Amino acid sequence: MAAVETRVCETAGCSSEAKLQCPTCLKLGIQGSYFCSQECFKGSWATHKLLHKKAKDEKAKREVSSWTLEGDINTNPWSGYRYTGKLRPHYPLTPTRPVPSYIQRPDYADHPLGMSESEQALKGTSQIKILSPEDIEGMRVVCRLAREVLDVAAMMVKAGVTTEEIDHAVHLACIARNCYPSPLNYYNFPKSCCTSVNEVICHGIPDRRPLQEGDIVNVDITVYRNGYHGDLNETFYVGEVDEGAKRLVQTTYECLMQAIDAVKPGVRYRELGNIIQKHAQANGFSVVRSYCGHGIHKLFHTAPNVPHYAKNKAVGVMKPGHVFTIEPMICEGGWQDETWPDGWTAVTRDGKRSAQFEHTLLVTDTGCEILTRRLDSIRPHFMSQ
């Protein structure tokens, strides 16, 4: 850290004299960021590093703004980045969509860094909340609405449609149901849903790329209503797909459903990964290890942590009133991942395809209730494509 003129330490609760400044902030041109010691700097790192991400994102937006011609698409916005597969981003992104003021917003919606202070307050805890009857009813309502929004997205999936157009439909469907699209501005995520095509594992940002015949695409929906979040996703075929894609998507769905069949009071959360990996490996596929299922209710992400791979160290035992997601990400090749320079798009390191399915579940006295199930069919959409 570089020495600078005397200032007051920016760590919350510390008013000591500060002569050190974050070197990364200096490089990025961020003003301020003064600390009294390495210890204070390290103690503030979890929130401070978000300033770096925001500055990098704003720099990227400034670069994007230089593309002024209508229809001018940049498929290589990050000079020097080596893509792992054939997929490319299609920039610029459209502007952030507004949410009417009458719709209730989560605490991160208007935070400059998109940070959820309520989640940060419980970060690191392994205590799993048991929902009250009132909470459970709130979750039933919001999960039903999330399902309706995903069903709207499902009708959009076809060759020639851009993932940006799917995101637009999702955004409008949320507003029509008096819901806030939970991904929007969550740690500055720029869109209202995630769309993950082919080698994208998760957290793909909707953009101007048209879906192509033979693609697979996952659409991940979370909505917020009356203080609760509901979360689900499905993977879809785009037109006719090859047999490898069919096997991958079918196996991924089976991994989810076999894990759901095991959910009941007394089961350890770590057991779900054993079930998922056994079925994936039996079919020649691998299980992503970097991203997990999670508790969800008034918080978007909270305890329990639900890994999908075998021999994990997840903490906790299922009890009636627990609500959480299972969302296995299954890959054709290796499970290793990397992230695009946008800070969100997770892709397979070998460029091979990945699929995912997700439900939000309530542990009952005898088993579980799939809160995000389809009401008009027991089959996921891909089985009817």
Swiss-Prot record:
Sites where the protein binds a protein: 203, 301
UniProt binding sites for Zn(2+) 3: 220, 231, 358
One GO molecular-function entry: metalloaminopeptidase activity
Name of the molecule in the record: Methionine aminopeptidase 1
Self-association and partners: Associates with the 60S ribosomal subunit of the 80S translational complex.
PROSITE patterns, per database record: MAP_1, ZF_C6H2
One Pfam family of this chain: Peptidase_M24
